[in-house]
Amino acid sequence: MPTTDYQQVLNDITQEVAPLLSQGKVADYIPALAEVDPEQFSIAIYTTSGETFCAGDCTQQFTIQSVSKVMTLTLALQRYGDELWHRVGKEPSGTAFNSLTQLEFEKGIPRNPFINAGAIVTCDALYSRLSAPMHTMLETFRALSGNRCIAIDKKVANSEYEFRHRNAAMGHLMKSFGNFENEVDDVLWAYFNFCAIELNCIELAKAYNFLANNGIDNTSGKRVLPSRQTKQLNSLLFTSGLYDAAGDFGYRVGMPGKSGVSGTVLAVLPNKFTVAVWSPGLNSFGNSVAGIAALELLSKKLDISIF
């Protein structure tokens, strides 16, 4: 479909999902997120040719939460390559994103890098190689998004850190199996700061556009990941990016994706575009009600899929 049609499609989708904005529930287990107005929506496409299309609350920033895990993995792969997979797996979990039972059963090796335990151990790996992990993460998002003012919402980071106990339990459990190198609380502080980075949908789609462009940032022309690793990362996003709703998302949307409890969803159509959508009301799986519906509509209207 010609890119000139994208704007009208996004406008139509924004109107069609409007009745869904009152559905779902914001993530109230993180006090700072519980204060967000649930009836907000934005969606943006950033193409591999550098075109931007957006509808809804395009300039509204939000914390990206678990969508940051994709960049954590990217930075870790840059520094470890395949060595990283000795510490974290590549399989779908089929359980809740913060499950301790599965982690115990599999002797401290998380199923994949997108469940909490997997992201935390990936963050631990980064912590071992970076002197200033939060600075590196911020600078990466600033460079890839084109916004040098990207910042961390410290209120959200502090709120998540205060209620870190289950995530801390995962870290200590992995440490008991010899799969954790640094102080758990130090790593969690970095992890929650990554989650509390604020972008809008345009910035988010642009920052991750290298996933649709064979690993190359099309603004700078610099390679972020080798082409093969980019394909592998997209494969993991398809199988595990939406936790135990990944299969349903793959069936309905047909693209690799990653969600976050702020109501953010990122999706990738290789060689075409990245799309970011945000709407805070969540379903029982912790995914955005309007966001998932919007991406399904996009897939149908453009007749797109990776298959």
Curated annotation (Swiss-Prot):
Keywords (alphabetical) are:
Hydrolase
Superkingdom in the source lineage: Bacteria
Residues the record lists as binding substrate? 66, 116, 160, 167, 191, 243, 261
Record-listed E.C. numbers = 3.5.1.2
Pfam families noted in UniProt: Glutaminase
Q: Tell me, what is one Gene Ontology molecular-function annotation carried by this entry? A: glutaminase activity
Family, per the entry? Answer: Belongs to the glutaminase family.
By its UniProt entry, which NCBIfam families does this protein fall under? Gln_ase, PRK00971.1-1, PRK00971.1-2
Could you describe the subunit structure of this protein?
Answer: Homotetramer.
Task: Please state what the protein is called.
Answer: Glutaminase
Name the source organism.
Answer: Pseudoalteromonas translucida (strain TAC 125)
